[in-house]
């Protein structure tokens, strides 16, 4: 019977589509990268999602985040993403967690339930905790490195964390993961040299903040605000999703 995934099934086959429909993917960070990861996964037939993010859609997200429109500003990102998932696949199972994942609340998550874990957050502490928990549970995990201050979408590639270059976030992650004995980690990163922003947006944000009421991570609290464009984090997210689908339809390494 023809359905919304029929064209995908022509490439992956019925058995893999069944496997994807039963896969439970946890995505930490529903922003510029994470939103596109989820978008591609649900359109590829993944049937179960755990969306983790405590932030609300901000006006400044509209330039790059698939969930951000004038209508969704002020709404929780996980709620907007859930609605979008169910519009695409009403049979999907979606759990939303309105929290910022850190060691302090790690006990609230059972990683052993997940088929795959996606780290699409910006904070190093959170990234490390997500990765370590996934590794401990033997769950496949993939991590997004920096997408801010970049202009070349073709510079993204999949690599082991210890083979990354140029990315400042990847440099920090290499050091911290090596300290913790992590031997390997699949990541998506850009080898493009970061572009220096033409202006310091954090200055204007202090006097003209447009963050929605109740936002947890206001721009006024950030030391530096990176520049961004629509065609960079989206590509990173789609590359991540492609790798996840490949792994879920074969046998991914942990």
Locate predicted features:
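Hydrophobic/small residue at the entry helix of a nucleotide-binding pocket
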Residues: 33-34
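Conserved SAM/SAH-binding loop
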Residues: 98-106
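Short, well-ordered coil/turn residues at beta-beta hairpins
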Residues: 120-121, 144
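Conserved N-terminal Rossmann-fold NAD(P)-binding element of oxidoreductases
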Residues: 27-29, 52
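Glycine-rich phosphate-binding loop and adjoining beta1-alpha1-beta2 segment
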Residues: 46, 51-89
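Glycine-rich phosphate/adenylate-binding loop
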Residues: 112-113, 126, 136, 141, ...
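N-terminal charged helix/coil linker that caps or initiates catalytic domains
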Residues: 1-26
